[in-house]
Each structure stands twice: as C-alpha cells, then as structure tokens.
Swiss-Prot record:
InterPro entries: CALM/Myosin/TropC-like, EF-hand-dom_pair, EF_Hand_1_Ca_BS, EF_hand_dom. Ca(2+) 2 binds at residues 86, 90, 92, 97. This is Myosin regulatory light chain. Gene3D superfamilies: EF-hand (1.10.238.10). It comes from the Eukaryota. PROSITE patterns: EF_HAND_1, EF_HAND_2.
Length: 147
C-alpha cells in the first residue's frame, strides 16, 4: 500500500501542466504505478462513477484507497469479515469497535475520514450498527469522490 506521500508524488508526475488535475485517461497508468492492477472493466466503472474528464488529488486518493473489485465481490468479502467478528451472530458490530477497525486495519482511514463516514451510519440506541446495511452503504451508496 502506498503512503500518502507516494500517492501525492505519483499524482504530481501525471499532473503534467501542474494545474492540480490529471486527465481521466491517465487513471489506469497512475493506479498501476502505485501497484494497483485494475482491469479495463474496473477502470470503466470508476471513470463512469467519476463522470469527469479530469480528477484532482483528493479524488485520486479516494480512488486509490477504494478496493478494485465488483460491488458483489466487495460485499461478500466485507460481510465475511464482519461475520467472523460477530461472536453473537446477531448481525451487528458496536460503533466503537467499528471505529477502531476503520482506524487501524488494512488501508486505515484517518480520524476525519472515519468521522465523515460515521455521519452516514445508522447507530441503534445501544451503539450497535447493522453491518449488512453498513456494507451496502459502502458498496453502493457512499460517494466515491469527495467533491
């Protein structure tokens, strides 16, 4: 996984005229230079979601951190992981536990990214989050680009 500095350096290399934007046609090359290997279908999906001729650094960071898999594959992997953590088998995870996972595992999020994400999450009175709804939100309903 590339560091924030490596992502920024990569973006600057592809930002040939130093205007803070990179052509959408360069997205695949930029991602590959950081070790991602998106298929053409995955790139077309991302380009369709972005719906723009160019992207900025914030959008590139978001795209880089997003898993490059189909929504069905993403959902299955995330649900399998949550089910493994769900000792009671009740389909929920505590808000505090989810925050810790997001801050510390895999491509960890920053505190501000976790706060933004948690604003979108429905939490029950006892602090529980239905992880199937959470996964569905991440895969289908959470904005790809922070505009």
């Amino acid at each position: 996984t590339a560091s924030a500095d490596q992502i920024q350096e990569c973006f600057q290399i592809f930002d040939k005229d130093n205007d803070g934007k990179v052509s959408i046609e360069e997205l695949g090359s930029a991602l590959r230079s950081l070790g991602k290997n998106p298929t053409n279908a995955e790139l077309n999906t991302i380009k369709g979601q972005l719906n723009a001729k160019e992207f900025d650094l914030a959008t590139f960071k978001t795209v880089y951190r997003k898993p490059i898999k189909t929504p069905t594959e993403q959902s299955k992997e995330m649900l399998d992981a949550f089910r493994a953590l769900d000792k009671e088998g009740n389909g929920t995870i505590q808000e505090a536990e989810l925050r810790q996972l997001l801050l510390n595992l895999g491509d960890a999020l920053t505190s501000s990214e976790v706060e933004e994400l948690m604003k979108e999450v429905s939490v029950s009175g006892d602090g529980a989050i239905n992880y199937e709804s959470f996964v569905d939100m991440l895969v289908t309903g959470y904005p790809l680009a922070s505009a």
